[in-house]
A protein has these predicted regions:
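C-terminal motif of bacterial Sec signal peptides marking the signal peptidase cleavage site
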Residues: 20-23
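Bacterial N-terminal signal peptides that target proteins for export
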Residues: 2-14
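Extended, charge-rich alpha-helical interface modules
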Residues: 25-148
Length: 148
């Protein structure tokens, strides 16, 4: 009887570990260009995943991420918006305009059908941050006299 209890406890521990490791799927997959966008909780694993994604975006000399189509999850994670904010001095006028349009459309995207599953708090935080980033990008565009 005792051996069976130990076996059940071991099985439960292994299953729990498996669930923990898959909670933020793709954490250890560096090849996924969208990694860091869908893991939205504040667990250490998700925070690390978002940080890794942001570092990869900032290291991209071609800034190919600027033209990627964002998802509501990407807006909610804040990764793309942080990247636009961090690189605003280096972006071309065209890239700044693209970033501003993306930030301006974030609130609508977050509240749309693809944003289902996001909490009201996530939507609110991401919408406020997007508005802040939009203002910063607009200020940068005016300072450089970029055409809207």
């Amino acid at each position: 009887m005792r051996a069976r209890g130990l076996q059940n406890a071991t099985l439960a521990a292994v299953c729990g570990l498996g669930l923990l490791l898959t909670a933020c799927g793709g954490l250890f997959d560096g090849g996924d260009p969208k990694a860091g966008y869908s893991c939205l909780d504040d667990s250490p694993e998700c925070v690390e995943q978002r940080q890794m994604r942001l570092k990869a975006m900032l290291a991209d000399k071609d800034r190919a991420w600027v033209r990627d189509a964002p998802t509501p999850q990407a807006h909610a994670s804040g990764v793309r918006l942080f990247a636009f904010r961090a690189r605003k001095k280096e972006l071309s006028c065209e890239e700044l305009a693209h970033g501003r349009r993306e930030a301006d459309g974030a609130a609508k995207s977050l509240r749309g059908p693809d944003g289902q599953g996001l909490s009201p708090a996530q939507i609110s935080r991401a919408s406020m941050f997007a508005a802040e980033v939009s203002r910063e990008l607009s200020t940068e565009m005016r300072a450089r006299r970029c055409k809207a």
